[in-house]
């Protein structure tokens, strides 16, 4: 018999943020690390393309702020979700682990949002 009042789960929201963080960390973050940490210092990427004025102008624009926000927040959700489930798999039971890890991710997301808005 089908339960007429099924219990709703909040897990799809967290899995969505986890999945988005995983895709971002796999596709976008390596490109940025390659550009900023390898190609630019070796002189294989024109330095004036990432000059201070251009980077500041990009970071001050709406698209730049969204990019920086996503560059910080999505990997953060990925990492905290992985830590939460790793603790569960290792049978290290954190009291109210869901509140601890997802609450920390939410707090850090709000802190990042405030920081990005006030740039």
UniProtKB/Swiss-Prot annotation:
InterPro entries: Fumarate_red_D (IPR003418), SQR/QFR_C/D (IPR034804). Keywords: Cell inner membrane, Cell membrane, Membrane, Transmembrane, Transmembrane helix. Pfam families: Fumarate_red_D (PF02313). The keyword Cell membrane applies. GO terms for biological process: fumarate metabolic process. The chain crosses the membrane at residues 26-46, 58-78, 99-119. It is a multi-pass membrane protein. SUPFAM superfamilies: Fumarate reductase respiratory complex transmembrane subunits. GO terms for cellular component: fumarate reductase complex; plasma membrane. It is found in: Cell inner membrane. GO terms for molecular function: succinate dehydrogenase activity. It comes from the Bacteria. Two distinct, membrane-bound, FAD-containing enzymes are responsible for the catalysis of fumarate and succinate interconversion; fumarate reductase is used in anaerobic growth, and succinate dehydrogenase is used in aerobic growth. Anchors the catalytic components of the fumarate reductase complex to the cell inner membrane, binds quinones. Part of an enzyme complex containing four subunits: a flavoprotein (FrdA), an iron-sulfur protein (FrdB), and two hydrophobic anchor proteins (FrdC and FrdD). Belongs to the FrdD family. This is Fumarate reductase subunit D. The gene is frdD.
